[in-house]
Amino acid sequence: MLFILAVIALLITFILVPILIPTLKRMKFGQSIREEGPQSHMKKTGTPTMGGLTFLISIIITSIIAIFFVDNSNPIILLLFVTIGFGLIGFIDDYIIVVKKNNQGLTSKQKFLAQIAIAVVFFLLSDVFHLVEFSTNLNIPFTNISIPLSFAYVIFIVFWQVGFSNAVNLTDGLDGLATGLSIIGFTMYAIMSFVLDSPAIGAFCIIMIFALLGFLPYNLNPAKVFMGDTGSLALGGIFATISIMLNQELSLLLIGLVFVIETASVMLQVASYKLTKKRIFKMSPIHHHFELSGWGEWKVVTVFWTAGLISGLIGLWIGVH
Protein backbone atom coordinates (compact mmCIF):
# COMPACT_ATOMS: atom_id res chain seq x y z
CA MET A 1 0.00 0.00 0.00
CA LEU A 2 2.90 2.34 0.73
CA PHE A 3 4.07 1.99 -2.87
CA ILE A 4 0.61 2.94 -4.17
CA LEU A 5 0.43 5.97 -1.85
CA ALA A 6 3.89 7.07 -2.99
CA VAL A 7 2.96 6.82 -6.67
CA ILE A 8 -0.31 8.72 -6.13
CA ALA A 9 1.45 11.53 -4.24
CA LEU A 10 4.19 11.79 -6.86
CA LEU A 11 1.83 11.81 -9.83
CA ILE A 12 -0.62 14.35 -8.39
CA THR A 13 2.12 16.90 -7.76
CA PHE A 14 3.96 16.18 -10.99
CA ILE A 15 0.74 16.67 -12.99
CA LEU A 16 -0.52 19.69 -11.05
CA VAL A 17 2.64 21.81 -11.28
CA PRO A 18 2.68 22.27 -15.10
CA ILE A 19 -1.04 23.06 -14.93
CA LEU A 20 -0.59 25.60 -12.14
CA ILE A 21 2.46 27.43 -13.55
CA PRO A 22 0.71 29.02 -16.59
CA THR A 23 -2.33 29.74 -14.41
CA LEU A 24 -0.18 31.62 -11.89
CA LYS A 25 1.56 33.50 -14.71
CA ARG A 26 -1.78 34.47 -16.24
CA MET A 27 -3.00 35.72 -12.85
CA LYS A 28 0.33 37.55 -12.36
CA PHE A 29 1.06 35.66 -9.14
CA GLY A 30 4.78 36.35 -9.50
CA GLN A 31 7.48 36.65 -6.86
CA SER A 32 8.87 40.10 -6.10
CA ILE A 33 12.61 40.13 -5.34
CA ARG A 34 14.24 42.37 -2.74
CA GLU A 35 16.49 44.95 -4.38
CA GLU A 36 19.00 44.70 -1.53
CA GLY A 37 19.43 40.97 -2.19
CA PRO A 38 22.02 39.34 -4.47
CA GLN A 39 21.82 40.92 -7.93
CA SER A 40 21.78 37.47 -9.53
CA HIS A 41 18.31 37.01 -8.03
CA MET A 42 16.77 39.96 -9.86
CA LYS A 43 16.21 37.78 -12.94
CA LYS A 44 13.85 35.68 -10.81
CA THR A 45 11.38 38.56 -10.52
CA GLY A 46 7.97 37.42 -11.71
CA THR A 47 8.63 33.69 -11.25
CA PRO A 48 5.30 32.15 -10.18
CA THR A 49 4.97 31.60 -6.44
CA MET A 50 2.43 29.76 -4.24
CA GLY A 51 3.56 26.53 -5.92
CA GLY A 52 3.34 24.85 -2.53
CA LEU A 53 -0.36 24.49 -3.29
CA THR A 54 0.48 21.61 -5.62
CA PHE A 55 2.22 19.38 -3.10
CA LEU A 56 -0.19 20.37 -0.32
CA ILE A 57 -3.13 19.27 -2.48
CA SER A 58 -1.26 16.06 -3.23
CA ILE A 59 -0.55 15.46 0.47
CA ILE A 60 -4.16 16.12 1.45
CA ILE A 61 -5.69 13.86 -1.23
CA THR A 62 -3.22 11.02 -0.70
CA SER A 63 -3.48 11.24 3.10
CA ILE A 64 -7.27 11.01 2.95
CA ILE A 65 -6.87 7.83 0.90
CA ALA A 66 -4.31 6.53 3.42
CA ILE A 67 -6.72 7.05 6.32
CA PHE A 68 -8.91 4.23 4.97
CA PHE A 69 -6.07 1.76 4.51
CA VAL A 70 -3.58 2.44 7.32
CA ASP A 71 -4.18 0.94 10.76
CA ASN A 72 -4.67 3.49 13.55
CA SER A 73 -4.79 6.44 11.17
CA ASN A 74 -5.39 9.08 13.86
CA PRO A 75 -1.82 10.43 13.52
CA ILE A 76 -2.48 11.09 9.82
CA ILE A 77 -5.67 13.00 10.69
CA LEU A 78 -3.75 15.17 13.15
CA LEU A 79 -0.92 15.77 10.68
CA LEU A 80 -3.50 16.73 8.05
CA PHE A 81 -4.89 19.34 10.44
CA VAL A 82 -1.42 20.85 10.91
CA THR A 83 -0.73 20.71 7.16
CA ILE A 84 -3.93 22.54 6.27
CA GLY A 85 -3.61 25.00 9.15
CA PHE A 86 -0.06 26.16 8.49
CA GLY A 87 -0.59 25.92 4.73
CA LEU A 88 -3.61 28.23 5.02
CA ILE A 89 -1.60 30.81 6.95
CA GLY A 90 1.05 30.71 4.23
CA PHE A 91 -1.55 30.95 1.47
CA ILE A 92 -3.15 34.05 3.02
CA ASP A 93 0.30 35.59 3.46
CA ASP A 94 1.21 34.88 -0.18
CA TYR A 95 -2.17 36.16 -1.39
CA ILE A 96 -1.73 39.50 0.40
CA ILE A 97 1.81 39.88 -0.96
CA VAL A 98 1.10 38.87 -4.55
CA VAL A 99 -2.50 39.94 -5.15
CA LYS A 100 -2.82 42.90 -2.81
CA LYS A 101 0.72 44.04 -3.74
CA ASN A 102 1.62 44.38 -0.06
CA ASN A 103 5.18 43.09 0.35
CA GLN A 104 4.72 42.69 4.11
CA GLY A 105 1.91 40.14 3.80
CA LEU A 106 0.42 39.23 7.15
CA THR A 107 1.90 41.23 10.00
CA SER A 108 4.25 39.34 12.33
CA LYS A 109 1.61 39.57 15.05
CA GLN A 110 -1.16 38.18 12.84
CA LYS A 111 1.01 35.31 11.63
CA PHE A 112 2.26 34.51 15.13
CA LEU A 113 -1.23 34.49 16.66
CA ALA A 114 -2.55 32.23 13.89
CA GLN A 115 0.36 29.81 14.36
CA ILE A 116 -0.20 29.79 18.13
CA ALA A 117 -3.88 28.99 17.58
CA ILE A 118 -3.03 25.97 15.43
CA ALA A 119 -0.45 24.74 17.96
CA VAL A 120 -2.95 25.04 20.83
CA VAL A 121 -5.69 23.21 18.91
CA PHE A 122 -3.16 20.50 18.02
CA PHE A 123 -2.38 20.07 21.73
CA LEU A 124 -6.07 19.93 22.63
CA LEU A 125 -6.85 17.35 19.94
CA SER A 126 -3.94 15.14 20.94
CA ASP A 127 -3.63 15.48 24.71
CA VAL A 128 -7.10 16.49 25.90
CA PHE A 129 -9.29 14.66 23.37
CA HIS A 130 -6.77 11.81 23.01
CA LEU A 131 -6.84 11.70 19.23
CA VAL A 132 -3.20 10.66 19.49
CA GLU A 133 -1.36 9.62 22.64
CA PHE A 134 2.14 10.94 23.19
CA SER A 135 4.25 11.80 26.20
CA THR A 136 4.40 15.34 27.54
CA ASN A 137 7.91 14.59 28.81
CA LEU A 138 10.90 16.02 26.97
CA ASN A 139 13.42 13.21 26.46
CA ILE A 140 17.12 14.06 26.45
CA PRO A 141 19.07 11.87 23.97
CA PHE A 142 21.74 9.49 25.34
CA THR A 143 20.51 9.93 28.90
CA ASN A 144 17.77 8.55 31.09
CA ILE A 145 16.65 12.10 31.72
CA SER A 146 13.04 12.84 30.87
CA ILE A 147 11.77 16.29 31.81
CA PRO A 148 8.04 16.25 32.73
CA LEU A 149 6.38 19.34 31.29
CA SER A 150 2.71 18.41 31.79
CA PHE A 151 0.52 21.30 30.58
CA ALA A 152 3.62 23.44 30.09
CA TYR A 153 4.21 21.14 27.12
CA VAL A 154 1.73 23.25 25.16
CA ILE A 155 4.20 26.15 25.44
CA PHE A 156 6.89 23.90 24.02
CA ILE A 157 4.59 22.82 21.17
CA VAL A 158 3.89 26.45 20.29
CA PHE A 159 7.60 27.28 20.35
CA TRP A 160 8.52 24.19 18.30
CA GLN A 161 5.85 24.47 15.62
CA VAL A 162 6.08 28.23 15.22
CA GLY A 163 9.88 28.16 15.31
CA PHE A 164 10.34 25.49 12.68
CA SER A 165 7.58 26.74 10.37
CA ASN A 166 9.43 30.05 10.21
CA ALA A 167 12.82 28.33 9.98
CA VAL A 168 11.86 26.51 6.77
CA ASN A 169 10.36 29.75 5.50
CA LEU A 170 13.69 31.57 6.02
CA THR A 171 15.58 28.74 4.29
CA ASP A 172 13.39 28.88 1.18
CA GLY A 173 15.50 31.53 -0.54
CA LEU A 174 17.41 29.49 -3.14
CA ASP A 175 16.02 27.30 -5.90
CA GLY A 176 15.41 23.79 -4.58
CA LEU A 177 17.08 24.36 -1.20
CA ALA A 178 14.12 23.95 1.15
CA THR A 179 12.49 21.31 -1.07
CA GLY A 180 15.61 19.12 -1.13
CA LEU A 181 16.28 19.52 2.60
CA SER A 182 12.66 18.61 3.33
CA ILE A 183 12.89 15.44 1.24
CA ILE A 184 16.02 14.46 3.19
CA GLY A 185 14.38 15.28 6.53
CA PHE A 186 11.17 13.38 5.86
CA THR A 187 13.20 10.39 4.67
CA MET A 188 14.94 10.31 8.06
CA TYR A 189 11.63 10.55 9.89
CA ALA A 190 10.07 7.86 7.68
CA ILE A 191 12.81 5.42 8.67
CA MET A 192 12.60 6.49 12.33
CA SER A 193 8.82 6.06 12.36
CA PHE A 194 8.93 2.48 11.13
CA VAL A 195 11.79 1.58 13.50
CA LEU A 196 9.85 3.07 16.44
CA ASP A 197 6.69 1.19 15.37
CA SER A 198 4.70 4.24 14.24
CA PRO A 199 3.60 3.06 10.77
CA ALA A 200 0.91 5.72 10.29
CA ILE A 201 3.45 8.52 10.78
CA GLY A 202 5.84 6.61 8.51
CA ALA A 203 3.16 6.41 5.81
CA PHE A 204 2.59 10.16 6.07
CA CYS A 205 6.33 10.78 5.72
CA ILE A 206 6.38 8.62 2.57
CA ILE A 207 3.54 10.73 1.17
CA MET A 208 5.50 13.89 2.00
CA ILE A 209 8.66 12.61 0.31
CA PHE A 210 7.00 11.70 -2.97
CA ALA A 211 4.74 14.75 -3.11
CA LEU A 212 7.90 16.88 -2.81
CA LEU A 213 9.77 14.75 -5.36
CA GLY A 214 7.04 15.63 -7.86
CA PHE A 215 7.64 19.32 -7.14
CA LEU A 216 11.45 19.30 -7.06
CA PRO A 217 12.15 19.16 -10.85
CA TYR A 218 10.19 22.40 -11.31
CA ASN A 219 11.83 24.06 -8.30
CA LEU A 220 15.47 23.37 -9.19
CA ASN A 221 17.64 26.15 -10.59
CA PRO A 222 16.45 27.87 -12.68
CA ALA A 223 13.16 27.47 -10.82
CA LYS A 224 9.98 27.52 -12.86
CA VAL A 225 7.94 27.98 -9.67
CA PHE A 226 8.51 28.79 -5.99
CA MET A 227 6.67 27.06 -3.14
CA GLY A 228 6.00 30.38 -1.38
CA ASP A 229 4.94 30.71 2.24
CA THR A 230 2.08 28.38 1.32
CA GLY A 231 4.54 25.51 1.16
CA SER A 232 7.35 26.52 3.50
CA LEU A 233 5.24 27.33 6.58
CA ALA A 234 3.39 24.03 6.20
CA LEU A 235 6.60 22.01 5.85
CA GLY A 236 8.11 23.48 9.01
CA GLY A 237 4.95 22.90 11.00
CA ILE A 238 4.81 19.29 9.81
CA PHE A 239 8.45 18.65 10.76
CA ALA A 240 7.86 19.93 14.29
CA THR A 241 4.65 17.92 14.64
CA ILE A 242 6.24 14.65 13.53
CA SER A 243 9.11 15.06 16.00
CA ILE A 244 6.56 15.73 18.77
CA MET A 245 4.36 12.75 17.89
CA LEU A 246 7.37 10.43 17.86
CA ASN A 247 8.55 11.84 21.22
CA GLN A 248 11.83 12.60 19.48
CA GLU A 249 11.55 16.38 19.57
CA LEU A 250 15.24 17.16 19.94
CA SER A 251 16.13 14.95 16.96
CA LEU A 252 14.82 17.79 14.80
CA LEU A 253 17.75 19.96 15.86
CA LEU A 254 19.95 17.61 13.81
CA ILE A 255 17.54 16.41 11.13
CA GLY A 256 16.62 20.06 10.56
CA LEU A 257 20.08 21.44 11.38
CA VAL A 258 20.36 23.57 8.23
CA PHE A 259 17.00 25.18 9.05
CA VAL A 260 18.31 25.89 12.57
CA ILE A 261 21.54 27.43 11.27
CA GLU A 262 19.67 29.59 8.75
CA THR A 263 17.42 30.93 11.52
CA ALA A 264 20.32 31.45 13.92
CA SER A 265 22.18 33.46 11.26
CA VAL A 266 19.25 35.87 10.97
CA MET A 267 18.95 36.24 14.75
CA LEU A 268 22.70 36.83 15.14
CA GLN A 269 22.72 39.33 12.28
CA VAL A 270 19.87 41.35 13.77
CA ALA A 271 21.30 41.24 17.31
CA SER A 272 24.79 42.21 16.14
CA TYR A 273 23.54 45.17 14.11
CA LYS A 274 21.32 46.44 16.92
CA LEU A 275 24.09 46.16 19.52
CA THR A 276 27.19 47.13 17.53
CA LYS A 277 25.88 48.56 14.24
CA LYS A 278 28.03 45.91 12.54
CA ARG A 279 26.95 42.87 10.56
CA ILE A 280 28.41 39.40 11.10
CA PHE A 281 27.44 38.15 7.65
CA LYS A 282 27.41 39.88 4.29
CA MET A 283 23.71 39.10 4.23
CA SER A 284 21.36 36.81 6.09
CA PRO A 285 20.01 34.15 6.00
CA ILE A 286 23.46 32.60 5.71
CA HIS A 287 22.88 31.08 2.24
CA HIS A 288 23.00 34.64 0.86
CA HIS A 289 26.32 35.23 2.67
CA PHE A 290 27.88 32.41 0.66
CA GLU A 291 26.36 33.74 -2.57
CA LEU A 292 27.86 37.17 -1.93
CA SER A 293 31.18 35.44 -1.15
CA GLY A 294 31.31 34.16 -4.73
CA TRP A 295 29.59 30.78 -4.47
CA GLY A 296 27.18 29.92 -7.26
CA GLU A 297 23.59 29.21 -6.24
CA TRP A 298 23.79 25.54 -7.21
CA LYS A 299 26.99 25.11 -5.16
CA VAL A 300 25.35 26.59 -2.06
CA VAL A 301 22.32 24.33 -2.49
CA THR A 302 24.32 21.12 -2.97
CA VAL A 303 26.65 21.89 -0.04
CA PHE A 304 23.68 22.63 2.21
CA TRP A 305 21.91 19.45 1.02
CA THR A 306 25.04 17.46 1.86
CA ALA A 307 25.26 19.06 5.30
CA GLY A 308 21.56 18.30 5.81
CA LEU A 309 22.06 14.66 4.81
CA ILE A 310 25.00 14.17 7.18
CA SER A 311 23.30 15.86 10.14
CA GLY A 312 20.06 14.06 9.28
CA LEU A 313 21.73 10.65 9.43
CA ILE A 314 23.21 11.54 12.82
CA GLY A 315 19.78 12.69 14.02
CA LEU A 316 18.23 9.45 12.76
CA TRP A 317 20.86 7.36 14.55
CA ILE A 318 20.26 9.23 17.80
CA GLY A 319 16.49 8.95 17.40
CA VAL A 320 16.45 5.16 17.08
CA HIS A 321 18.93 4.49 19.90
Curated annotation (Swiss-Prot):
Gene Ontology process terms (BP): cell division; cell wall organization; peptidoglycan biosynthetic process; regulation of cell shape
Localization annotation: Cell membrane
Coiled coil segments of this chain: none
Reactions listed under catalytic activity: UDP-N-acetyl-alpha-D-muramoyl-L-alanyl-gamma-D-glutamyl-L-lysyl-D-alanyl-D-alanine + di-trans,octa-cis-undecaprenyl phosphate = Mur2Ac(oyl-L-Ala-gamma-D-Glu-L-Lys-D-Ala-D-Ala)-di-trans,octa-cis-undecaprenyl diphosphate + UMP
Any Gene Ontology CC annotation: plasma membrane
Main location as per UniProt: membrane
GO molecular function: metal ion binding; phospho-N-acetylmuramoyl-pentapeptide-transferase activity
Protein name listed in UniProt: Phospho-N-acetylmuramoyl-pentapeptide-transferase
Biochemical pathway: Cell wall biogenesis; peptidoglycan biosynthesis
HAMAP family reported for this sequence: MraY
Family to which the UniProt record says this protein belongs: Belongs to the glycosyltransferase 4 family. MraY subfamily.
